[in-house]
Amino acid sequence: MNTVKSQHCVGDIRKIKPLLKKAELLVRVNPWNGESVEEINRVIAAGADIIMLPMWKSAEEVKNFLDAVGGRCKTTLLLETREAVECLDEVLEQGGMNEIHIGLNDLHLSYGLTFMIELLSNGVVERLCRKMEEKGVPYGFGGIARLGSGDLPAERIIMEHYRLHSTRAILSRSFCNTEYVRDIKEINELFDKNMCQLREYEKLVEKCSKEELLKNKYEIQTAVEKIVKAKKEKKNGYR
């Protein structure tokens, strides 16, 4: 798979923290394990503002994580396993987290799906969002590519964020891919340009009616069906 796992360490937190003026520093720790308490303590001591727990599979893991943090910083749960979906009601009943982010890539693999946006078109993300909204827990999902890019254009995904009342998203690698752009000045300019375009598009989406957002949902379903069909045909050697 075309994925990247950054080899960061606790020392990187100390380097980045002093450079931040407005942004909060979010640190994703390892999935819950026997060394998690020690890792969380070190991450907090280094200056993390928010800690993200990935790949959790039970309400007990979430409780252990929240107990380990002990209110010393904000917490976000990365919901990216089928087991997490199945125990979400219990997790929400326990409460204590600051926010939840739905990770579409690993979650679609957990369900054995072909394309991660199937989780939007088949209603899974919507059901999860409604549950979190009902409990008053801030939430978001997936990653956003730069406008005009992605298997499914980023514009359509952004409209779904608004329809589902999502308040946060992760920028995908394609938003500003440092594999292809190495010069730091060019990276900054590209990021600023893409960010400005995104904000301008958001202003347009804010004015969309419920009918327009619902129409986009159905168009996503149609587009996803075609994308999935094409991916399956390619996998099976058809053209």
What is each PLM-predicted segment?
Residues 1-239:
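Expand to "…catalyze enediolate/carbanion chemistry for C-C bond making/breaking, isomerization
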